[in-house]
């Protein structure tokens, strides 16, 4: 599972990480009234504890949200005048051959948190470690285009992977085929560096605590009190330290969103995100608060364990997909501030200059139109599936549990809504399982569930990012589903240089996913209702920016 957004994710995670920045708005450290400079700091929160700082093993957005600030990638996705642009990270310049299959990255002068220089070999080691089947990297599918990747997965030497250190400051990456979005892929956590000596020194402890991790980014992980708080401190050894204005970041880990709301009101947080109607109105009325609403590249969705005795059946999965009234759910649970999903690929994604969702159309509407044309309801498909499985014709005999990754009041209210929804549409008595993120994630990875509900945030602006999650070799979303035709279409699309052909290949793949196999149930394209104290500047407004806290300022704090 994934960022970053990754890997990976409870519904409310879309409102928990503040973060990415743009390249403008830095005001510096402002002097107080007496003329003395005041160090800038930022107080924020997330709703679950990160699982690890090991970039080869993280999959959830909580972990990747922190890693994005303590690590530096080859390049980052920035914002300039409201548009995406690739900006330097460890690599200050880069170029490719004419075919787009050999990329050369020229590293600048950056250091690790122990003072040693970041080298091209650190990237070689990191990519090899993530590609190694023994590591179990949940995001290794981002390495699929790299030459030798398939051979390594089949047991070949790690040296087979197409990554090479020409010298300490020059990294060469060879691809099996040209990938139009390769630089965007390089912004992801799997392309971050790792120091071999540190990984080997700490073994299984690597990434589990601040002292068992090394950093090359704008911040260091100063403290990590699990399930309580994380403290980040500006790192002077960072290559772009002069541009980092906020000295200290405190990330409170709050299991209950209502605690965040009261902390914001008390001045203990500089940011809060919410979809709760009463709190939105309260925060909108505050004179000390700026409101930012963005439609992200995220999707909230239900998904099925296709190895389950019941949900192995496509008609039963279709019944559950059709039973959800997305517009009603949006109004009841989000106050109408999100958008009903129209596909798996969000409306924020494009292929070149063409918005993918506009090209592919509303596949959820197409599902209902097909059912209407055939005179079928959601319950009809459920009964058809039950007949195919020899389960009789009484939905109340079905034993079904819906798993949610949260235990607070919002999740319990949402669980009640789901029970009513599925009882009305399908006539079933649905059970709800509530658990904290760590337990929920563990159950998914072991296949110990029937239906789950999560949110997923795309790393970069190409449909491959989210469609590849369902490829056979990818266990990011543990559905157990495999389809050779789907795999072939997604792979062909990734390397297709003609935009029109690429669009059509992605559409065909998404059609299999949503209109033939019903493996996943896209429910909402959520908006982010973000509230910042008005002295906070430099936060991002675009979905795929990866700047982190380094471009933010709080210099106007009184």
Language-model regions: role of each:
Residues 202, 237-282:
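Ligand-site clamp/hinge motif
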Residues 323-356, 410-420, 444-558:
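Detector for C-terminal structural segments
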Residues 122-124, 139-197:
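Surface-exposed binding/hinge segments that line
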Residues 92-142, 172, 266, 310-312:
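Aromatic- and charge-enriched surface segment that lines or borders ligand/interaction sites
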Residues 340-385, 407-412:
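Structural transition elements
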Residues 226, 375, 380-458, 528:
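Ligand/substrate-recognition segments at binding pockets and active sites
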Residues 61, 79, 175-244, 248, ...:
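Gly/Pro-rich hinge or "lid" segments in bacterial periplasmic/extracellular proteins
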